[in-house]
Amino acid sequence: MAALDGLPPLRDVIQRHGLDARKALGQNFLLDLNLTQKVARTAGGLEGMTVFEVGPGPGGLTRAILALGAKKVIAVERDARCLPALAEIADHYPGRLEVIEGDALKADFESLAPEGAVKIIANLPYNVGTQLLVNWLLPKAWPPFWQSLTLMFQKEVGERIVATEDDDHYGRLGVLCGWRTEARMAFDVPPQAFTPPPKVTSTVVHLTPRKNPIPCSVANLEKVTQAAFGQRRKMLRQSLKPLGGESLLVKAGIDPARRAETLSVEEFCLLANSL
């Protein structure tokens, strides 16, 4: 992509700005510009879109998003060392890149969103990725301000996101994602694509909001899944005892002898609505 956007190779950018990835910030920089384009393309058409990015680092994915025609990228970066490298990209794409220095967990993304839906594309820092996803799934207003999420996680997290009942990876995250989105794993990214190479394979997950998820209280769904999966090997009559146990299950029409991993998203919503 260096030839396409006229900017130097990422390795040169990292060396020139002294950007060693820091474990404390959950950083692993994706250097392969062909892969960053593949990530950006997974989000679908970007022409005229506003895109939010978290943890752009030296800007490899940022460059891919801009090169594919995004109208504007709003990037939240906590590491001040990366700002000069991102400023060079902003100069190359005048008016199309806004960088906000700060903690993405504290950012109010919805207030930053322009009129019309946005897409969120990010190689998420490993230490905050799951919490950010949960934050984006929990707004009371639905459909949300975002049109799609295209996010990179450790593969184990990706498997939890797309898992359904009777899957070993199924848990609270799978229920939440299955309730409000349609999620798929797009492709894996090997450790050697990053600097420094992480110990595990990564995966890109693409999520789109369900227009009409089952009406259900977020707070009640959280209570039910926390209790059920907190003791996932026990029968539901035991794990849900603090919430009413057998009487709650009978009210929802669910066999009290079943276990959490056998319940569908719809059945968890039934339980939440029976509280």
Swiss-Prot record:
SMART domains: rADc. S-adenosyl-L-methionine binds at residues 28, 30, 55, 77, 103, 123. InterPro entries: KsgA/Erm, rRNA_Ade_diMease-like_C, rRNA_Ade_Mease_Trfase_CS, rRNA_Ade_methylase_Trfase_N, rRNA_adenine_dimethylase, SAM-dependent_MTases_sf. The keyword Zinc does not apply. One of its GO terms (cellular component) is cytosol. It is an enzyme of class 2 (transferase). It catalyses: adenosine(1518)/adenosine(1519) in 16S rRNA + 4 S-adenosyl-L-methionine = N(6)-dimethyladenosine(1518)/N(6)-dimethyladenosine(1519) in 16S rRNA + 4 S-adenosyl-L-homocysteine + 4 H(+). Keywords: Cytoplasm, Methyltransferase, RNA-binding, rRNA processing, S-adenosyl-L-methionine, Transferase. It is found in: Cytoplasm. It comes from the Bacteria. GO terms for molecular function: 16S rRNA (adenine(1518)-N(6)/adenine(1519)-N(6))-dimethyltransferase activity; RNA binding. Its main location: cytoplasm. Its EC number is 2.1.1.182. Belongs to the class I-like SAM-binding methyltransferase superfamily. rRNA adenine N(6)-methyltransferase family. RsmA subfamily. Specifically dimethylates two adjacent adenosines (A1518 and A1519) in the loop of a conserved hairpin near the 3'-end of 16S rRNA in the 30S particle. May play a critical role in biogenesis of 30S subunits. PANTHER family: DIMETHYLADENOSINE TRANSFERASE, DIMETHYLADENOSINE TRANSFERASE-RELATED. This is Ribosomal RNA small subunit methyltransferase A. It comes from Rhizobium etli (strain CIAT 652).
